[in-house]
């Protein structure tokens, strides 16, 4: 069905990119075979496959490899938080190694920039959790050098303020006050050391 939609879209628009969009496309159990099928169909026409953001998991290297088959887009990854402690609290089974290996592979394939999505203001968050955002973004930047691709990679860390939602474990927690948000943004910017890394919040 996805292939049929892609064929019709290409036939009617002539666009040279097919976007696989959903809440988390990279979590689809057949994402690799879907991408392989689309690449076989469209690679000769120089039509690339793209996804808005990738969940960090053990298949991330395979996904970025398939996205690079035609042209190199910037890669967007969503680690959400930067420490194991906070991951346990929000129940995200993300491993640092998966993120760094995925970034390493992306730089090696010729990607020139990367974007990371994070949250701040999660209940019980500490200074170390916030500092971890900057450290993680810097490590991703360094992975370009580790991959033998020259200098540091251009990384943008987009940090949004956590908003407690109804019918979730955090529904009774207050949202962070504007004064806290303003001060925390300033702190993140102050921690920034590498010109190749930009903290956006």
Predicted regions mapped to residue ranges:
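Auxiliary Fe-S-binding modules of radical SAM enzymes
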Residues: 11, 122, 130-201
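Conserved SAM/AdoMet-binding glycine-rich loop
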Residues: 4-115, 120-154
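Canonical Radical SAM [4Fe-4S] cluster-binding loop centered on the CxxxCxxC motif
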Residues: 1
């Amino acid at each position: 069905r996805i292939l049929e939609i892609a064929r019709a879209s290409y036939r009617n628009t002539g666009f040279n990119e097919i976007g696989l969009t959903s809440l988390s496309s990279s979590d689809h159990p057949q994402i690799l075979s879907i991408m392989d099928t689309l690449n076989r169909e469209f690679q000769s026409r120089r039509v690339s496959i793209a996804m808005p953001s990738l969940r960090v998991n053990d298949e991330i290297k395979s996904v970025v490899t398939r996205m690079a088959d035609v042209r190199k887009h910037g890669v967007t990854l969503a680690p959400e938080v930067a420490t194991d402690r906070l991951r346990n609290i929000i129940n995200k089974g993300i491993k640092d190694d998966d993120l760094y290996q995925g970034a390493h592979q992306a730089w090696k394939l010729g990607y020139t920039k990367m974007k990371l999505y994070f949250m701040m203001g999660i209940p019980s968050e500490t200074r170390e959790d916030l500092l971890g955002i900057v450290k993680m973004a810097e490590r991703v930047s360094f992975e370009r050098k580790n991959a033998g691709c020259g200098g540091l990679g251009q990384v943008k860390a987009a940090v949004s303020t956590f908003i407690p939602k109804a019918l979730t474990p955090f529904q009774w927690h207050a949202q962070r006050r504007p004064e806290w948000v303003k001060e925390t943004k300033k702190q993140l910017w102050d921690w920034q050391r590498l010109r190749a890394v930009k903290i956006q919040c």
